[in-house]
């Protein structure tokens, strides 16, 4: 089997919750993805730099607090400028599909398996483009 694409994941700046992100990371790794976990409370610039360095086709962002959603939006804006190829999956208790659309995410994952299913779709496109 071809190696699956790189995925960068992080909990956005200002948010210290990482249980959900950690579950997504474990599942993605179980499905064969090469996951770079930047941790929690990660500034937008750090996330963008990692995606660019790895040329990662997938970024997963997590936020659990309503106060950190603007940080998620700022991260997405920066990614659109620095890494326009990257597909952005967002998740967390304070998010829903409508909000994910509003802040410019490509996909809202209501649970960890939703994130994995979308990553699998992106990986198929990525492999086809190689």
Q: Language model features by range: what are they?
A:
Residues 21-31, 35-106, 111-120:
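Cofactor-cradling patches in redox/metallo enzymes
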Residues 1-10:
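Long, charged amphipathic helices and adjacent flexible linkers at domain junctions
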Residues 118-130:
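A charged, well-structured terminal subsegment
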Residues 12-18:
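C-terminal amphipathic alpha-helical interaction region
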Residues 9-12, 61-63:
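Short glycine-centered, acidic/aromatic-flanked micro-motifs in structured strand/loop junctions
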